[in-house]
Design a protein with these regions (language model features):
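N-terminal leader/signal peptides at the extreme start of proteins
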Residues: 1-11
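N-terminal signal-anchor/signal peptide hydrophobic helix marking the start
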Residues: 9-21
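Conserved acetyl-CoA pyrophosphate-binding loop and the N-cap/start of the following alpha-helix
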Residues: 18, 22-25, 53
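C-terminal juxtamembrane segment of a hydrophobic transmembrane alpha-helix
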Residues: 22-44
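Low-complexity, Gly/Pro-rich coil/beta segments used as flexible assembly/activation regions
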Residues: 48-176
Length: 176
């Protein structure tokens, strides 16, 4: 009678070591993505808050009558709505306060802030008490008779102390 040895079943130690190394490599690669995902999630949350602040302020600015020169806001205080000159579009507060970026009007945060056209907004929902700098510019177009025909509002919001993030800009035009 012939004594046959039963066939071996299962993994060898080398196969197990290779599988463990591949799995470990995959876990380490994925773990390196976690800090980046957390950073972009936080930045996106700040951008979303900036859009909400800008839209709230833009809604308030556009709801004002055309001839109003100021409006009082509970957060920003007295806000200027721009003043026009007969027959020509006038940019308020200054001609270089708004700049063109990729074909869109934006608030230039490299310029010094102008009183009446900026405020700081503290986020009440942020545990760290995030502060956002809010600025706006107004382009007023008057008729030859000196009557306001249209106002273009551009609102920019930027989180203070955030490096390498562009400010959020929203704009609208109100016409008679």
């Amino acid at each position: 009678m012939q004594n046959l040895r039963p066939r071996q079943k299962g993994f060898t130690l080398i196969e197990l070591a290779i599988a463990t190394a591949v799995l470990l490599f995959g876990v380490v690669a994925v773990m390196q993505l976690v800090p980046y995902a957390m950073k972009t999630n936080t930045a996106n949350r700040y951008d979303t808050t900036s859009v909400v602040i800008a839209q709230r302020l833009l809604d308030e600015l556009t709801a004002q009558p055309f001839n109003n020169l100021t409006v009082t806001d509970p957060i920003c205080g007295v806000m200027s709505l721009g003043a026009g000159a007969a027959g020509i579009p006038t940019m308020s507060p200054t001609a270089n306060y708004l700049t063109m970026f990729n074909g869109n009007a934006t608030v230039d945060f490299t310029q010094a802030a102008v009183a009446g056209y900026n405020c700081n907004y503290t986020d009440p929902n942020s545990a760290s008490g995030g502060v956002y700098q809010v600025r706006w510019g107004v382009v007023v177009t008057d008729s030859a008779a000196g009557k306001v025909v249209s106002k273009r509002f551009v609102v920019g919001v930027q989180r203070s102390a955030m490096q390498f993030r562009f400010p959020v800009n929203v704009e609208t035009t109100v016409q008679r």
